[in-house]
Amino acid sequence: MTDMSHQCVIVGIAGASASGKSLIASTLYRELREQVGDEHIGVIPEDSYYKDQSHLSMEERVKTNYDHPSSMDHSLLFQHLQMLKSGQPIELPVYSYVEHTRTPNTIHVEPKKVIILEGILLLTDARLRNELNFSIFVDTPLDICLMRRIKRDVNERGRSMDSVMAQYQKTVRPMFLQFIEPSKQYADIIVPRGGKNRIAIDILKAKISQFFE
């Protein structure tokens, strides 16, 4: 955990795929933005840092294990966190789930008082953990995560139910048990029931609000 006197405070939200991380992050961002303004708080998804696969064929890209730490460009994310905390802007990568690689575009992100960083593998990397001012693990039962993942990937990412189920059985569940669940030990706060846990969200809001004082 880092010194809270840094210019940019980084709050990490980790947990299984479809556990409710993004919902908690977006709820905190929306409600805190109403209090402090858009210039003081932002959200960065770890998904933006999947490695560039433009040099691979589509056949090779779709075989990528997206739930293994090696699929992430954590070195770039680590560099970007350091830049934000030192007051420098970053160019956030844009990842396409349809093309299974980065796009040529980036999003310009200015340092904020608080940045909420959310993703499945955040707490598996000691470099990233050391840049977080505090961290949250969203602890949602895997059967609920699976139902949410099917709905999301079919409706929003254009995938078939069979492909979602095959990926879940082959990589998502095994990688959760091997990497993501063990990383829960590094979280400062564990939130059960995901984005439906209003009491937990209010507690997190109160904690993050301290950084604006």
From Swiss-Prot:
CDD domains: UMPK. Its EC number is 2.7.1.48. The keyword Ligase does not apply. One of its GO terms (cellular component) is cytoplasm. It catalyses: uridine + ATP = UMP + ADP + H(+); cytidine + ATP = CMP + ADP + H(+). Pfam families: PRK. Its main location: cytoplasm. Pathway: Pyrimidine metabolism; CTP biosynthesis via salvage pathway; CTP from cytidine: step 1/3; Pyrimidine metabolism; UMP biosynthesis via salvage pathway; UMP from uridine: step 1/1. GO terms for molecular function: ATP binding; cytidine kinase activity; uridine kinase activity. One of its GO terms (biological process) is UMP salvage. Belongs to the uridine kinase family. This is Uridine kinase. It comes from Klebsiella pneumoniae subsp. pneumoniae (strain ATCC 700721 / MGH 78578). The lineage of its organism: Bacteria, Pseudomonadati, Pseudomonadota, Gammaproteobacteria, Enterobacterales. The gene is udk.
